Amino acid sequence: MYLSIIILPLLGSIVAGFFGRKVGVSGAQLITCLSVIITTGLAILAFFEVGFNNIPVTINLFRWIDSEWYNILWGFQFDSLTVAMLIPVLIISSLVHIYSISYMSHDPHNQRFFSYLSLFTFMMIILVTANNYLLMFVGWEGVGVCSYLLVSFWFTRIAANQSSMSAFLTNRVGDCFLTIGMFVVLWTLGNLDYATVFSLAPYINSDIATIIGICLLIGAMAKSSQVGLHVWLPMAMEGFFSRAFLKLHYMQEHPVLSLGPLRFSLFGKIQDQGQFAGNSIRSSSEITSEAFMLKESWFKWWFIGFVEGDGSFIINKDGYLEFRITQSSPDAQILFMIKKELGFGVVRKQDSVRNTHCYRVRDKNNLIKLISIFNGNIFLDTRKEQFKLWLNAFNLKYKENIPHIDSSFRPNLDNAWLSGFTDAEGCFTCSVYDNKSNTAKLVRLRYILSQKGNSSCMEYLAEILGGKKHLLKSYEGYNVTVNTTKLSPIVQYFNLYPLKTKKYITYFNWIKIYKLVIDKKHNDPENLLLIMKYKNNINKSDYNK
């Protein structure tokens, strides 16, 4: 049983990686998921057997290094600490595998991804169960290699390759210190076996013990991206921030978790308390304890688009200036993501009656950072005027002389502006009609952007999207509507620049219908039932509003 815990994820990875074309996408998904789930079940059994009964299990497979100076065995130790650590590692890995089936369903390289993911799990198990430092180092390096492979999963993207290389090289700093610590242990005790080291530890010179401890600590800090060695983490988000690097994905963006508004409100309260604690420690109302660098242009343009829809530049009656984004509380996770990416600002409950949260920035230095983002990069006419007045007020209040840059920016399908604007002002709809000429059904899909005023801007968006602009008198604004036959460029766009709010849930159902319609499978009775199911999910969803 204990060997199965170690071997099963490796077998799943080998099958998905080397025989992916034979077993197919579904086969690779099924084999890797089953191997990890079975491993999790076995680990739970091991937890009861070893943890409760306190009966450690040691497996020595073979001698790895055998010399007159030292002996290293390829062995594994299952004690109370090991099985306790295996439980969260394998449960989380199982959930990641299962969720990735739908999350990566549109990617053509599923087999490779699931192979990497199972290999990651295998290396984690090696890291946790090894009974000596050298074998632990093998698992340690394996986790680093798998992280590199996952971050650079889309290897045709330069940013992904740069991000993976940054993560890989930064982790080598930690590996260097870990290796030094291991050599000091070997030089001092002549053995790397845990049992030997722990039994002789009380007799080691205190200075040497301190050196060993510091080296091992720095190694762990680099691997877990702690202070000073965290610089690779923001770039590592490039690989799977928007798709499938789920072990580094912000949990508040998880579309499955987003389906539970009650749980989401609870998460928001936890975030509020965490923000308060961090603010208290740092003696600051806005600067977070771990500032993420704004390096990726995708976030910059997504953020600008989102703010043009839902943000505001406020000149308060009391004289202070403020930047604010307001969202309903069930969608507050996007505000926490923005705060995390920018590295400053406050997210808090705004209105208990209307159930809203807001992201707010008032600090002068952070407002200057926001000015550098928006100045000259705003598209909507009304937002340009608002920003210009706000910037003039800022210069007067703080006696600054920041020039206003007239914006000539025009959105296109080569940056994330439209994704952000859609998260704020877009929706996806589906209608099913009877065909009067025959028994077949007509399925109508639409992508809609809405905005009050800004007629010329909406006309431009209609032009680049291949849609039409409609005047809505009751709304005193305009809709840009793109119908089924013109949706292909938009679908390709959202594959490159995915939505970040819970509208992704609606889009996920909508795109399934789109694929059936494009493949002309929508009139199959079974598929028609699926379409009606997806349609109901779209139309009843609050996330599409």
From Swiss-Prot:
<dbReference type="InterPro" id="IPR003945">
    <property type="entry name" value="NU5C-like"/>
</dbReference>
<comment type="function">
    <text>Mitochondrial DNA endonuclease involved in intron homing.</text>
</comment>
<protein>
    <recommendedName>
        <fullName>Probable intron-encoded endonuclease 4</fullName>
        <ecNumber>3.1.-.-</ecNumber>
    </recommendedName>
</protein>
<comment type="similarity">
    <text>In the C-terminal section; belongs to the LAGLIDADG endonuclease family.</text>
</comment>
<feature type="region of interest" description="ndh-5 exons 1 and 2 encoded">
    <location>
        <begin position="1"/>
        <end position="239"/>
    </location>
</feature>
<dbReference type="Pfam" id="PF00961">
    <property type="entry name" value="LAGLIDADG_1"/>
</dbReference>
<keyword id="KW-0812">Transmembrane</keyword>
<feature type="transmembrane region" description="Helical">
    <location>
        <begin position="1"/>
        <end position="21"/>
    </location>
</feature>
<dbReference type="GO" id="GO:0006314">
    <property type="term" value="P:intron homing"/>
</dbReference>
<keyword id="KW-0472">Membrane</keyword>
<dbReference type="GO" id="GO:0015990">
    <property type="term" value="P:electron transport coupled proton transport"/>
</dbReference>
<keyword id="KW-0378">Hydrolase</keyword>
<dbReference type="InterPro" id="IPR001750">
    <property type="entry name" value="ND/Mrp_TM"/>
</dbReference>
<keyword id="KW-0255">Endonuclease</keyword>
<dbReference type="Pfam" id="PF00361">
    <property type="entry name" value="Proton_antipo_M"/>
</dbReference>
<feature type="transmembrane region" description="Helical">
    <location>
        <begin position="200"/>
        <end position="220"/>
    </location>
</feature>
<dbReference type="InterPro" id="IPR001516">
    <property type="entry name" value="Proton_antipo_N"/>
</dbReference>
<keyword id="KW-0404">Intron homing</keyword>
<comment type="similarity">
    <text>In the N-terminal section; belongs to the complex I subunit 5 family.</text>
</comment>
<feature type="transmembrane region" description="Helical">
    <location>
        <begin position="81"/>
        <end position="101"/>
    </location>
</feature>
<dbReference type="GO" id="GO:0004519">
    <property type="term" value="F:endonuclease activity"/>
</dbReference>
<feature type="region of interest" description="ndh-5 intron 2 encoded">
    <location>
        <begin position="240"/>
        <end position="545"/>
    </location>
</feature>
<keyword id="KW-0540">Nuclease</keyword>
<dbReference type="Pfam" id="PF00662">
    <property type="entry name" value="Proton_antipo_N"/>
</dbReference>
<feature type="transmembrane region" description="Helical">
    <location>
        <begin position="140"/>
        <end position="160"/>
    </location>
</feature>
<feature type="transmembrane region" description="Helical">
    <location>
        <begin position="30"/>
        <end position="50"/>
    </location>
</feature>
<dbReference type="GO" id="GO:0045271">
    <property type="term" value="C:respiratory chain complex I"/>
</dbReference>
<dbReference type="GO" id="GO:0008137">
    <property type="term" value="F:NADH dehydrogenase (ubiquinone) activity"/>
</dbReference>
<dbReference type="InterPro" id="IPR004860">
    <property type="entry name" value="LAGLIDADG_dom"/>
</dbReference>
<dbReference type="GO" id="GO:0042773">
    <property type="term" value="P:ATP synthesis coupled electron transport"/>
</dbReference>
<feature type="transmembrane region" description="Helical">
    <location>
        <begin position="119"/>
        <end position="139"/>
    </location>
</feature>
<keyword id="KW-0496">Mitochondrion</keyword>
<dbReference type="GO" id="GO:0031966">
    <property type="term" value="C:mitochondrial membrane"/>
</dbReference>
<feature type="transmembrane region" description="Helical">
    <location>
        <begin position="177"/>
        <end position="197"/>
    </location>
</feature>
<dbReference type="InterPro" id="IPR027434">
    <property type="entry name" value="Homing_endonucl"/>
</dbReference>
<keyword id="KW-1133">Transmembrane helix</keyword>
